[in-house]
Amino acid sequence: DAKTGDQLEQLLSTLSLAVTRFQIEPERSEVPPGDALIVCGPKSAPIGAELINRDPALTFTKAGRRWWIEHRPSGERYGSPADEDQPQNADVAYVARHRTDERVVVHIAGIHAIGSLGAVHYLTANLATLYGETDDKSFSLAVRSTYDGLDITGSELAAGPFVW
């Protein structure tokens, strides 16, 4: 997660946005004031679960010992290839932008921590295109990425973006 934070800070700096990093307490369920970029899953902090619960398109679900990103309307699921019987060096992550009044809250949650890093890789390469598709609206999507150790070797859209 530290590497994800570093890469997010670098991305935001290239957009001339000021960054103040801080760690969210594990028991926190409320979004901090102002615009925010939050990296955590629903199992690691209540704030992650709270943000995902606001999303009408995607959610996290657990079946057996595996976590999945699920498209609520269709029930289609996106699981981590790292959790398959024949594991691959790949993961899936959830990305959402919540627009509330004049605030923007971006939420990133990998099924595993490396998935969050893959989401940042995807956003770095596709931010302009993504904005062109979603304008200034709330949306969510799923990203699939491949990795070698802690280095992301590729990323692609797995589902979405779903505008809401």
Question: What would you call each of these model-derived segments?
Answer:
Residues D1-W164:
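Solvent-exposed alpha-helical segments and adjacent loops
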